[in-house]
């Protein structure tokens, strides 16, 4: 830090230089985030100083959070929904806004562990959860932070969790299962209804990570079951800052039962509320305002159009890639495509270095991963495929 402050002009010149080093979304096919909607940006600015970590001081921002959770509950077929005020949850389903999927996943598993421990279940070994091999890396953080064993079930030929593998991994120390509704690499949806049956049969919790798919699946022509309509689902993570078009950070975690939030509570004697159940103390009221604004502005119709646009882009890139001889690993379920190309790691490297395209790679099998988002356009796809054709031709004939 300087001894004396810089001028406003100097500061913004410095910031603009830093901004110029960021990647413009124009050539990004690798991210599950996108440009926030303009109304979300304006709402964020209006509540920039609001702290949801001290609800009594920011009652207006808290009302917006409650409204967001209510709307998300309706979207995810919760019969009734509530955000606790002063640590009390009044209705059957509770939730709050998080920083994103990682925090939501951590808190969901923390709730599982706390409830099982409160029930005085005795373990013969380390408590464990069973997750798909395709699950997000946030569950590695769960294992590290909470001393929980993470057991990874194998995937079937369509990259969904294999139910036989799940059942084989369950033992007397298992506290819960995890299903993914829109996995990061393939956009695939696990059979949540089947996981629900197994969870209920074994008296286990079932958390659904719908961080990406939560704002996609409900608006598909033929949505698969994944939410609170499925009886065994006990918690859901959903990220408005992805396909919900809100500002970053905007995530959400919903629980079927208020007992989950009760298990997460800690005393906060020096705040305006007596207890707190969130992982972070200070929380952004601006994110609540941004999410509330964009959800009310777009409504179901707006989100349906958003998903339809992204699915049209998905169909276009698959169709045009096939003409070049590149097949998808699976027929896309949502707006994520994994293309089979020769030497995908080298293709990715050259696409970035020569043409500035940002794509990513799936782990197993190796393939070119593309996420078709609202910031992409049909023209982007045409340019990208032209460059992909050039790069693969160079690799075949060095």
Swiss-Prot record:
Cystines in this chain: none
Source organism of the structure: Methanosarcina mazei (strain ATCC BAA-159 / DSM 3647 / Goe1 / Go1 / JCM 11833 / OCM 88)
Any GO molecular function: aspartate 1-decarboxylase activity
Keywords: Decarboxylase, Lyase, Pyridoxal phosphate
Pfam family, one: Pyridoxal_deC
Function statement: Catalyzes the decarboxylation of L-tyrosine to produce tyramine for methanofuran biosynthesis. Can also catalyze the decarboxylation of L-aspartate to produce beta-alanine for coenzyme A (CoA) biosynthesis.
Cofactor or coenzyme needed: pyridoxal 5'-phosphate
Entries under InterPro entries matching the protein: GrpII_AminoAcid_Decarb, MfnA, PyrdxlP-dep_de-COase, PyrdxlP-dep_Trfase, PyrdxlP-dep_Trfase_major, PyrdxlP-dep_Trfase_small
EC number: 4.1.1.11, 4.1.1.25
Residues modified as N6-(pyridoxal phosphate)lysine: 242
Gene3D superfamilies hit by this protein: Aspartate Aminotransferase, domain 1 (3.90.1150.10), Type I PLP-dependent aspartate aminotransferase-like (Major domain) (3.40.640.10)
UniProt pathway annotation: Cofactor biosynthesis; methanofuran biosynthesis; Cofactor biosynthesis; coenzyme A biosynthesis
Name of the protein in its database record: Probable L-tyrosine/L-aspartate decarboxylase
Similarity comment: family membership: Belongs to the group II decarboxylase family. MfnA subfamily.
């Amino acid at each position: 830090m300087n001894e004396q402050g810089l001028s406003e002009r100097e500061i913004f010149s410095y910031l603009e230089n830093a901004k110029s080093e960021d990647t413009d979304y124009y050539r990004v096919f690798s991210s599950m985030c996108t440009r926030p909607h303009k109304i979300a940006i304006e709402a964020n600015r209006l509540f920039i100083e609001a702290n949801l970590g001290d609800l009594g001081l920011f009652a207006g921002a808290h009302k917006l959070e409650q409204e967001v959770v209510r709307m998300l509950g309706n979207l995810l077929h919760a019969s009734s929904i509530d955000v606790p005020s002063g640590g009390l949850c009044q209705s059957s389903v509770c939730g709050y806004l998080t920083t994103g999927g990682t925090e939501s996943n951590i808190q969901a598993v923390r709730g599982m562990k706390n409830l099982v421990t409160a029930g005085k279940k005795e373990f013969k070994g380390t408590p464990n959860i069973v997750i798909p091999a395709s699950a997000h890396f946030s569950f590695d953080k769960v294992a590290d932070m909470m001393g929980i064993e993470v057991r990874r079930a194998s995937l079937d030929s369509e990259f969904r969790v294999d139910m036989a593998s799940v059942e084989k991994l369950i033992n007397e120390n298992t506290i819960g299962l995890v299903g993914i509704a829109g996995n990061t690499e393939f956009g695939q949806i696990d059979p949540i209804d089947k996981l629900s049956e197994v969870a209920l049969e074994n008296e286990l919790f079932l958390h659904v990570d719908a961080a990406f798919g939560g704002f996609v699946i409900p608006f598909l022509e033929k949505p698969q079951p994944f939410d609170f309509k499925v009886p065994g689902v006990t918690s859901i993570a959903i990220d408005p800052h992805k396909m919900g078009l809100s500002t970053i950070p905007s995530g959400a975690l919903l629980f079927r039962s208020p007992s989950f939030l009760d298990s997460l509570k800690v005393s906060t004697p020096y705040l305006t509320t007596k207890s707190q159940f969130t992982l972070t103390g200070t929380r952004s009221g601006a994110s609540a305002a941004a999410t509330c604004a964009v959800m009310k502005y777009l409504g179901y119709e707006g989100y349906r159009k958003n998903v339809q646009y992204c699915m049209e882009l998905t169909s276009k890139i698959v169709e045009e890639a096939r003409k070049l001889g590149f097949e998808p690993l699976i027929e896309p379920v949502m707006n994520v495509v994994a293309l089979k190309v020769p030497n995908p790691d080298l293709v990715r490297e050259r696409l970035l270095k020569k043409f500035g395209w940002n794509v990513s790679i799936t782990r197993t099998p190796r393939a070119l991963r593309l996420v078709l988002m609202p910031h992409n356009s049909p023209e982007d796809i045409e340019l990208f495929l032209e460059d992909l054709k050039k790069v693969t031709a160079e690799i075949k004939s060095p």
